[in-house]
Amino acid sequence: MFENDILVAGADPGFGAIKLDIGDTKILFPAVICNGSERIFSTLGRTELERGSDIDRQVASLDVIVKNNSTGVERHYFMGSLAESLNPKEAHYCWDEDKSTDEEAMSLLIVGLALAQPYPKTNIYLGTGVPVKFYASLKDKYEAELKGSFSVTFLSGPFKGQTRSMNILRSRVLPQSYGVFIKETLTEDGNATNAKLFGGYVVVIDPGFRTTDIATFYDGIMLDPPNSFSIEKGLQWAYTGVAEKLKEMTANHASPIETDDKELDKIFRVNKGLYPWNNGAIDLNPVMKRMLSQLAADISREVMKTLKPMAGRIHTVLVAGKVGEMVFEYLNLENKVLIDDPQFGNAAGFRIMAANLVNNLTRKVNVD
């Protein structure tokens, strides 16, 4: 994790959730944000998880001030589940594909890093990724923008009153899905862990919140488009279908239910798919299963169509991501394998990539 006092971190700042991996610590929270405000009544009673680690309880109470130490600009935000609870009308996802210049998206990433860092002040070497379709246009921009000095002050939770500062020394960017391949094939020291995946055709499928990224490898090398590509469909598409069905199911009521992906994400994440309704609840799980099955069918069809020239020669299809785990059983693809800890597949791989780069730099300095 540490090389010469540098914290090596892997970040997967998706449209639906922030995932951070520093080796022995992983951070996960909904990528939901809104402007913060003074809290009066919301501080009364039980506002935090009673169980879990300090980090678990802090993740549930992200009332923070984020400061760019280079510009002096600071912002007060509610993030994650706290934003969903305290300001559901204003809480939102960050939809900009270019997160490097989106102040709110950057703040979500900075807070994730602050949660992960073990010391009040830390130097960070960051590995992260962008969707396959945007890699060529955004890689250099991300690496130029994702660095600098920042601080986070926690206004609630176990870390209340603490300020954590960081200096992001450098960021290295890979395509989404490449992180999964690295996780499955390399150690932090650059040693191979699965020789089979370095030979022949291997496909990585990483369904996400808005998009599904597909990366094709031959002898360990990621192939260019059209063999590596993005599908504009993910969990959000399934939520849209669930919302339409829910409205249809309550159409005869005086006030048919109109919901959105943000609320449904919380319903499935917190309420296990039970939508509170009329002194009871509507079980949305059967509808969700049908939508996930259709999503998997669409992904399978697109993969088979695009990769038809190599049909029969793909010996492993690695499936990653939380959404990948949800659709895995429905994917109609041969030789499919669900990786271990699928939600952190990219974040772990990006960390391993960054660790290898730091180790290489350290060895070069020692040799010189």
Feature locations, PLM:
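Nucleotide/phosphate-binding catalytic cleft detector across ATP-hydrolyzing
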Residues: 1-202, 221-232, 270-368
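Short beta-strand scaffold segments in enzyme catalytic cores
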Residues: 18-21, 212-216
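A short mid-domain helix/strand-loop element embedded in enzyme catalytic domains
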Residues: 177-179, 208-213
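Conserved active-site beta-strand-loop modules that form the wall/rim of enzyme catalytic pockets
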Residues: 201-203, 210-215
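Long, well-ordered mid-to-C-terminal structural blocks that present hydrophobic/aromatic surfaces
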Residues: 207, 216-259
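C-terminal amphipathic alpha-helical segment
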Residues: 238-296
